[in-house]
């Protein structure tokens, strides 16, 4: 995702694994061209493969089944504050492992990582809380909006951005060293993808201070239109424009407009 003030990009943001593209963009900028950055780009792509392999290996070591009924290792919770999500996490008894807030997409949209069975237990707690508040509302003992978040399991096989993946980071760095790759860059990439919490909400809002929001345009490069929707929710009402460039057709149209 490229953020532009007129013709000059002021920032490049990547959501979750999109950080790989951010590092590739920086490498191209530092080298002066795609051709000059070729070796670094190849290494980043190779590290991406190592990250995936290390994550898969760690999941097997943990005995983490990527499916538990409908549950997966990551659960989107939309329509709940961080405090409400943390309260639900505390209600899960006898969890197999940590349930962590992996991604903060907005003030009321969070994604959790953990064992699928633990996330399924949290989903049950959310349903119990909804029914409890609905009953209180029906009895006129509770005012305001009834707690009713939208829950959706992500189609993933790893609990990304989770402390469960700490050993996978070390494994990735070890393999990268054996391959002769830059271990510092490898660690940074692996931690961003596997371990660190992603505060997308804060990253996007930081742009508001980078330039006049009314002059900023965000170009969504995909893949798909999910990211455009996520960022649209954060920048709504700020004056920042969002342009979709997720397909060849959309990019071709933008190139034509720019040349005109």
Q: Model-flagged regions — what are they?
A:
Residues 4-9, 159, 163-260:
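Acyltransferase/transacylase module recognition
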Residues 8-11, 154:
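A generic hydrophobic-helix recognition signal that picks specific residues
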Residues 10-18, 22:
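Gly/Ala-rich beta-loop-alpha elbow adjacent to hydrolase catalytic centers
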Residues 15-17, 115, 221-223:
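Glycine-rich beta-strand-to-loop/alpha-helix junction loops that act as flexible
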Residues 21-22, 26, 228:
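Short helix immediately C-terminal to the catalytic nucleophile in hydrolase catalytic domains
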Residues 25-188, 192-193:
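Alpha/beta catalytic cores of group-transfer enzymes, especially the acyltransferase/condensing modules
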């Amino acid at each position: 995702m490229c953020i532009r003030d007129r013709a000059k990009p002021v920032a490049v943001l990547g959501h979750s694994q999109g950080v790989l593209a951010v590092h590739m963009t920086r490498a191209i900028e530092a080298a002066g061209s795609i051709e000059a950055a070729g070796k670094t780009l190849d290494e980043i792509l190779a590290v991406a493969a190592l990250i995936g392999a290390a994550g898969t290996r760690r999941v097997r070591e943990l005995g983490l089944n990527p499916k538990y009924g409908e549950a997966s290792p990551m659960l989107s919770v939309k329509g709940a504050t961080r405090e409400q999500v943390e309260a639900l996490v505390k209600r899960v008894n006898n969890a197999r492992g940590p349930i962590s807030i992996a991604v903060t997409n907005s003030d009321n949209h969070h994604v959790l990582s953990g064992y699928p069975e633990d996330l399924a237990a949290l989903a049950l707690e959310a349903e119990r809380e909804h029914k409890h508040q609905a009953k209180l509302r029906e009895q006129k003992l509770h005012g305001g909006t009834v707690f009713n978040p939208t829950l959706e399991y992500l189609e993933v096989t790893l609990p990304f951005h989770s402390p469960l993946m700490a050993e996978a980071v070390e494994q990735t760095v070890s393999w990268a060293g054996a391959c002769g790759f830059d271990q510092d860059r490898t660690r940074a990439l692996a931690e961003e993808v596997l371990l660190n919490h992603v505060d997308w909400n804060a990253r996007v809002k930081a742009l508001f201070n980078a330039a006049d929001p009314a002059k900023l345009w965000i170009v969504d490069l995909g893949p798909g239109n999910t990211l455009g929707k996520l960022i649209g929710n954060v920048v709504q009402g700020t004056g920042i424009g969002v342009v979709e460039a997720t397909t060849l057709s959309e990019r071709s149209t933008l190139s034509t407009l720019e040349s005109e």
